[in-house]
Design a protein with these regions (language model features):
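OB-fold and OB-like single-stranded nucleic-acid-recognition modules
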Residues: 1-315
Length: 315
């Protein structure tokens, strides 16, 4: 199985951040190791109309080789002296260039059997820069993604408001070649037609490279509650709309089921591995909830071991 592309580039001013310095516990592989975890939100334009969050799960001061980790140093600097759009204004906010990858966060809400999977921009290098080194506003390079993807579903969506668009579902891969579900959209008419014409399905997956821009906007609306007396109550509701908007694709898709790309057997294996991962997530969630409620842990979720039949991939 070839190495698959999964890269992002995020540039702009720090909108706000939630970074914390922590120490690994006694049951970890390296107990007592300091690390930083949390999120940096980047405003890619002066109006802060597109705010892209990047998550950091574990950033230690050094690599396993003992070499200093510059990403840790940069995140530490943000914690101690970083300025944000929220507290200091756009002009004074710290400028950054981030190089995360597309990832997902899998979790099971307590008491529910269905996994929740949300997209996440994860990890990568962090560089604190000067304003003159940023790409111009409007440049797609400020919020770009590029991924190799196996497409298995393309659906035309007609919303109640706004123009029709096409939704593209598939899987991409992390640096370990683990499968990551991804949902993208195409709003350009030519792009929409291109993806619909692929006739991609679970029995006829299409393996290709796509790229585009990460659009993360916040939509505000008001809910008015009338009162029998006195003034009505007005609540502001903020809804986040996140899109991976495709702006380009390879002219010719990769060949599928070949040794030089990915074979049907390899695809079946990575999909099976994801089922095992989700079973482990469920097991950990159940054990955590049980310990939190001071009850005995429920039986561990069984990992999926059945093979995925060729030509009928279980996405």
């Amino acid at each position: 199985m070839r190495k698959n592309e999964n890269i992002e580039n995020i540039e702009g001013k720090i909108y706000q951040f939630d970074l914390k310095e922590k120490v690994t516990g006694e049951n970890s592989k390296n107990p007592g190791t300091p690390y930083i975890a949390g999120t940096v939100e980047v405003a890619v334009d002066a109006e802060a109309s597109n705010i892209v969050p990047v998550h950091y799960t574990y950033v230690a001061p050094t690599y396993s080789s003992g070499k200093s980790n510059n990403t840790y140093t940069a995140l530490k600097q943000i914690i101690t002296s970083g300025k944000t759009v929220v507290t200091d204004g756009y002009d004074m906010a710290t400028c950054v260039k981030l190089n995360p990858s597309y990832s997902v966060n899998d979790w099971y809400p307590q008491g529910q059997e269905t996994v929740q999977t949300t997209p996440r921009n994860e990890g990568g290098f962090v560089n604190i820069v000067t304003p003159d080194t940023l790409r111009p506003e409007g440049d797609i390079g400020r919020h770009k993604f590029s991924v190799d993807v196996i497409i298995f579903e393309v659906t035309e969506i007609t919303p109640d408001e706004g123009d029709s668009y096409v939704q593209i579902k598939g899987i991409t891969f992390d640096f370990r070649n683990a499968a990551l579900p991804i949902t993208m959209v195409a709003r350009n008419a030519a792009a929409a037609k291109y993806f619909l014409d692929l006739e991609a399905s679970k029995k006829n997956p299409v393996y290709t490279k796509v790229w585009g821009k990460i659009v993360n906007t916040y939509i505000k609306s008001e809910k008015v509650t009338e009162s029998a007396f006195g003034e009505a109550t007005v609540d502001t509701i903020v809804r986040r709309n996140r899109e991976y908007l495709i702006t380009g694709a390879n002219p010719v898709p990769y060949e599928f089921d070949t040794e030089g790309t990915i074979t049907a057997a390899e695809l079946s294996k990575v999909l099976q591995d994801r089922e095992v991962h989700l079973a482990e997530v469920k097991k950990n969630s159940e054990e955590y909830n049980a310990s939190k409620n001071a009850k005995s842990a429920s039986p561990a979720a069984q990992a999926a071991t059945a093979s995925v039949p060729q030509g009928g991939f279980s996405f």
